[in-house]
Amino acid sequence: MNRGFVAFLGCAAALMAETVPVPKVTKLPVTADSRPLGAANHTLEAVDLAKLGYVEDEFIVSGTANVYDWNVDGTVKVKIPNAPYANRILVRHPADPKKFSGAVMVEIMNAARKFDWGMMLGYLGDHMLERGDAWVGVTQTASLDGLKKFNPARYAALSFANPNPTESCVVLDARGGGKNAPPSTSPMEEGLKFDMLSQVAAALKSTAAGAPMAGFKVDAVYMTTQAGDIVTYINAIHPRATLASGKPAYDGYLIKNVAAAAKIRNCGDTPGKGDPRGPVKDVNVPVIAMVAQGEVVAGLATARPDSEKYRRYEIAGAAHIDKYAYASLPSFPDQIAASGTAQGDPSWPFTAKCDPDIPLSGQTLLKYTYNAALDNLDNWVRKGVAAPKADRIKIKDGASAPEIALDQFGNGLGGIRNPWVDVPVAKYETTSPGPGTCAELGHTLPLNKDRLKSLYVTPQDYGKKVALDVDKLVKEHWFTESDGKKIKAELVAQLGK
């Protein structure tokens, strides 16, 4: 046999080995005694999906996944091949295929409280309903125990069993400033989640009977979440996650609070400051990274320039988090069932209060900017219209440590603008004093009456300036047309015509 042909067959086999398989998908029934954790009608702000023309289904996704090593030079190698896993996904989509937009947003659900929390759903949910998108929540390894406590029978099959359970990790604190953790073993392997995520995308694009989106024309599948896992996926896994069609598993990415990459497996190292694996790499699909003003300084180490496929959007005046993120938390009874406790109450879902006490911000600044970013990403992927570039938030010159440059009202300069900072009536603090989450919560300091009178002749003058600013932001694609109309309608309700 011709050696060249043999070599070709070898290359073809290698390529086939890299093809993302479609996992087994099993639908879980909903009964009087068994339902999903995080079901829409059992969240802090319950949603009746049926009234909105949507349905919700839950599936177990199972298959085999590799565990990888990821070297500092960026090379990725299989450490343990074909380890079995089983995970759950929660899927929401229009009941009528004709009303489906063609876009699916996959969210790696937040596991900070040891149960699933669709944080980005809290921000984007209303807009995705308006667009006709599908949303898919994917469980993280850290939430598995919470699911099993919530309903042991329903979630008995879920597993990220460690294929090398006796491996003892000596985890170095690559970020600095802390102590190295003592050697430890784990019954679960975090690294299985990365191939699992690729296979979830393959399942969502599958047209086979029983597939989660069977009967729906899926044009694009996106991934969203906050912080490190999505960066690791983009940098290490995306280049090798190719479907049988030859297309990438994911068609684009929307990142909240882009940070350094996370470790790729239990005993992998976490890329630290200066590690070339940390910043988001250019890949063959669009990536939009969202950074609130309150996140900018901490994220400077991994900030990078925009490129043909990458945009970084820094949002002036915005804190890390606000009330919209918490709307999609499971209901308090479900939180208690999953973790044994629930923090605070629905109006303040934290154990400790800030000092002084502040309300949980209902500022729509992040929500509206995320909505526009989703539209920009979708247009970039499906229409080839590149997302606009934005100025970065300005850093003060000459400071001993990085510090945001502020305008005369105390709000950040530069970045993606909005009427709250362009036509100000307050200073928007992006952090608050107090324990726990307070450092991530913003609060508002209203300008005094004399200052307001010097800025706006009448309330109607203020309203006119806001409306003009909103029109400009909509035209520049920083707000959606729908959200622009909402802001102006609220102005009319407050101020009159």
Question: PLM features: residue spans?
Answer:
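Bacterial N-terminal signal peptides that target proteins for export
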Residues: 1-8
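Hydrophobic h-region of N-terminal signal peptides that target proteins for export
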Residues: 9-18
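Compositionally biased, intrinsically disordered low-complexity segments
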Residues: 8-9, 398
